[in-house]
Amino acid sequence: MDEDRHALFEKLLQQLDLTSEADQPYFQTATVDRLTVHEQSRRWQFLLKLPSMLPFTAFVDFHNHLQVAFREIATVEATIEVDQPELTNRLLGDYWEWIVKNSGLTSNLIQELCQSQVPELDENNRVLLYAQNEVVKDFLSNQALGPIESAYRRAGFPKFNIHVMIDESKSQAKIDEFKARQEKTDAQLAQQAAAAIEKANQKRQSQGDTPAAEGPTQIGKAIKGDQPVTKMIDITQEERSVVVEGYVFEKEVRKLRSGRQLLTLKITDYTSSFAVKKFSRGAEDEAQFAGVEEGSWVKVRGNVQEDTYMHDLALNAYDINQVKHASRQDTAPEGEKRVELHLHTSMSQMDATNSIGDYVKQAKKWGMPALAITDHADVQGFPAAFNSAAKAGIKMLYGVEANLVDDGVPIGYNSAHVPLDGATYVVFDVETTGLSAIYDKVIELSAVKMEHQNVVDQFEEFIDPGFPLSEQTTNLTSITDDMVAGSKSEEEVFKLFREFCGDAIIVGHNVTFDVGFMNTGYQRHGMAEISNPIIDTLTLARFLYPTLKSYRLNTLAKRFHVSLEHHHRAVYDAESTGHLNYLFLKDAEDRYDIQYHDQLNDHMTDNDAYKHARPNHAILLAKTQAGLKNMFKLVSASNVDYYYRVPRVPRSVLEEYREGIIVGSACSSGEVFTAMMQKGQVEAAAKAKFYDYLEVQPSAAYQPLIDSGLIADRENMEEIVRNMVKLGHDLNKPVVATGDVHFLNPDDYIYRKILIHSQGGANPLNRQELPDVHFMTTDEMLTDFAYLGEETAKEIVVTNTQKIADDIDEVHPLKDKLYTPRMEGAEDEIRQRTMDTAHAMYGDPLPELVQHRVDRELKSIIGNGFSVIYLIAQRLVAKSNKDGYLVGSRGSVGSSLVATLTGITEVNPLPPHYRCPKCQYSHFYTKGEYSSGYDLPEKDCPECGTLMIGDGHNIPFETFLGFKGNKVPDIDLNFSGDYQPIAHNYTKVLFGEKNVYRAGTIGTVADKTAYGYVKAYERDTEQTFRGAEIDRLAKGATGVKRTTGQHPAGIIVVPDYMDIFDFTPIQYPADDQSAAWQTTHFDFHSIHDNILKIDILGHDDPTMIRTLQDLSGVDPTTIPMDDPGVMGLFSGTDSLGVTPEQIQSKTGTLGVPEFGTRFVRGMLEETHPQNYSQLLQISGLSHGTDVWLGNAEELIKNGTATIANVIGCRDNIMTDLINFGLDSETSFQVMEHVRKGRGIPDEWQEKMKATDCPDWYIDSCLKIKYMFPRAHAAAYVLMALRVAYFKVYFPIIYYAAYFSVRADDFDVVAMSQGKTAVKAAMKAINDQGMDASAKDKNLLTVLELANEMLERGFKFKMIDLEKSDAADWIIDGDTLIAPFKAAPGLGLNVAKQIVAARNDRPFISKEDLAKRGKVSKTLIDFMTENGVLAGLPDENQLSLFDDLM
């Protein structure tokens, strides 16, 4: 029997491909004792008997082969029983991690707690684990130990129990030991697993697996076309051998430590989504991995399993086939394709999902000749539309869906010169079955006749509509079927009402609604419309009281104390309206002398009447280039002059700028369709005359109107559309079928739904089911309008849309060149300033090197029209310097000698040199002897004996304006944050207010925000999404316009020979009408190459320098750049008089700009810089990407290079290569490629190798992803050394400035208690490690400086009620007094209020402080606890002198 069982085991080994001698030793007498097959769940359970324990590596090898061999037919489980089981520390430890992972523990926390250590045997052979406390012990004992013990027994171990002991120190030691051990074994186990799987796969393939197909990517076997495909939404639990088909929306290939690759795809079939994982089996798989692309469709076969890493179901694939997926096709013949004229992109704020590029690509694929973009109230998609259309070669039509409003809504209708005082009024109200005068009926007509505010007669009649009332009607009006059944007919009641009215003035609230129903009824019965004078109390109230938030009848009644007993019953509404009418007319007479009915509309455009007009959508298309500019003016006016909740376009303003614009009637929110739906053809015809063409939409677009009852049913909807088409024919206006498109494909509907849901009740679209408004093919649109007949359908879908597209010119929303402003004499002034300063510094004639550089730069600057850019920068810097604030340069402007000579930057780009300030003698070092002139040793002038100045940083001009000198200069300037608003406003002085704007930005939905929207939607709709589905939905919602803003520094300058509308519309940032600056409507990146942008940045360094200068009286420009004490900070702490241990830093650069972070301090510790040029190198290295870590750092460590000659800044590459012997043009090209992370082409590498360029230099270049400009680094180091000078020689002034200017977060209690308390606070934050909050990390930086100051012998004092400033730290001898702002939770405004109140008169009590200083009880308590309010009573006390205070 045992022989049979052993034979079974031998057969099993053959199936597992474990038959070599190396695999056999542990299995010589092994048997298969039992095999249990669960057919329904496809699970096989082996019971195996082995003579002895398997070493862990053999166990894992066997387990992996077992899983691979049967993976396509069953899930395999194996239980091992061992004749002589062992229990040793080694076996326990070897198996531990695998056991924990495979014991069914579902909690991440439990797995982490278990895997962080390894159990051990004590002297009594007990298995012990250690816990840090009782809570952890209970947690492990109750939830982890049982499954783990069982898993060990299934692996062949003897039965044992694990005992948890509490020992904090041992627990930590075990964790550390385990981590070290785990790192050592991970790679080995992964390699063994990979080898096992590879071996098994090779065997199966050699036994006749289907060969890989050519063409589309195929990983694994081919999946037969007849194999059933499961919908992802139907997969809710683990399953074997499932086939799914999906769109790849995310792909990642990751290299594992074992050397294999892991392919992870996220795919969707639009019912749900799945993460698919596949491990490579060799180079062939890895090549196929590269062939799977995002945007393709794949068919996948594999097992659905719970992924312990993702904590979600995932599809572990064994076969992935790229497949063709059926997509929508436009089969209309060429020349008969429709043109979409109403389309929203992701620039329609929070309402549409796809970019214009998506639509253009689809339109091109379908062969459509043109496409319109018509976003809601903005044209921010135009730049992308222009570029996409040009690339695709289709015509782009530029439009906008405007919110059209009447300039003012009439108060009176049927104007008549009749006196209002003493007139008879009939105030009436109707109740109806709906909102459409055409399709709904009046069911109650009530009125009161009033004279001198008294009711003199009453009219009240129900009308039988001839059909049962809906539940909605009864709920809204309180009118039931019983009340209207058997009532008089509409015709009879309307006749009676006319007799009742006589010649009285008719009044109603929103009277156009009621009159609309009445006039439609009169028309229906062949009677004349109402001709009496009419007053609308709704528009009258809006005119008289424009600041009210609501004008509903019940709200107004409450506001003016008028009784309204039962709102939405006609007679009660009428009487209340009558009383309001009396009050309003009396007020109108008193304020505006309105005495006659025909005076009511004299002021209807007053008081921002456009705000109260109902916006109607209208499509504006730019027909000509002039029309585009007019459109820009309209969009600007709507955002700047007529913004109220949404940007509005008054009808008169549209008329003013209508030239070159085609106006369409838009969607169901347009006034023509609304009139046709609610008031009929006569009213619609009157509205339609304003438009150039009329629009109708497919049936899905109107479904919300049917759902809400505004349209009775589809039949009525089709009738309205027929009437719209007829109206177009009657008026000789083209009617076009448009999609009102909001997303590309039907499956994209959910993305828009999530966006709308995120806005809550604020968006009315949340109150209805959203329509399916996807981008339709010609076939789809023709099918939808088939009810109109084939000829008419083709006319509105194809013929008319093409005609409108053909009538529109080719329009260009972007310019093709840069338009710079003009400043009279700019060229001459720049040349003169340059030469004057050059001669003052270097003499006349100039040295040849200087003359050549100046000539070359001036030729480039003046020849390309850049003089004005330089002059603007010069004026800004000069004004700031004059006002007492130094300006730091950013970027590459320091590469320009002209910028230096005109005072724009302090950085001198010439080669290192001496120059004499007295006789202008100079000597240059041009062969790389020095990197910076600041490093030159002191030397007297050989001509006159004066101490010479060292200058020059060897920066090529090419890095600023390009090799040909024609690149638009981008001059970035660092102004003091305090001075930045003044500098911004100074541009208005230079160019005029209408020629300068802030650079606009567009904020879109970010990944994390979209994720939040999806999670909220999931919660509110009570659904559960897989992680991959959440990722898919979030991806669909990202990139959509959410808000607008402004660049913090960018100022756009419009040349005086053009206006802003030649480039872009304008608006306020984030629609904030109170903002100080208007911004460009287009994102400034879109027009960067067309119009000048000046970056006037706000920065702390210039503010810090100004503060230090004010406190010390030292001119920062006189500070030497080679002071030994200052330079010592960068390599030690001696200059501060403290040890590294005292300040917990090996350098003294805490708080020194650019050199105070842990990362840079670490660089300083490794490099020990000794001079300016080495600091410049470190500045460049610290700002680059892949420049220091894994690159320069390694070269310095292994002695290949030094800090002096590694590549620190981008400019080094060009100058180094020229010094190595490479030609200047190739040197420039290499620099440009390397700084952008593009590597170096082989031909250039060969050129480099032919020079003196070392191999390590080329290798270093190839690793770099981004490099910092040398001029920028030079400016930063310059500021840093100035600040550092004060830190060394004026310490208390330095710390006062630092804490006042650069610090925001304080622990004023710890700081005032001394260094022990500060060190404790630092330790508390450091102990949090990565869990420390951003606020705590900022506080740690402040505490490090506070500790340093205390160690240097200075002190902090708690807030002083009498001495403290609002925000600045006050110097009091060797002590800094904390400002009020340092108190936790006390903001700057309250701090200023306290100081202002104190300056007014001293505080006499805590009550007084709270009242006059606006200080909260929490802050009063804080001040009391910390002695700030010592001696101050709680409450005010009566005093004889109170009246004098």
From Swiss-Prot:
Keyword Endoplasmic reticulum: no
GO terms under biological process: DNA-templated DNA replication
Chain segments carrying region Disordered: 193-223
Enzyme Commission designation: 2.7.7.7
Protein location: Cytoplasm
One GO cellular component term: cytoplasm
Exonuclease domain mapped to chain residues: 425-581
Family, as annotated: Belongs to the DNA polymerase type-C family. PolC subfamily.
Protein name (record): DNA polymerase III PolC-type
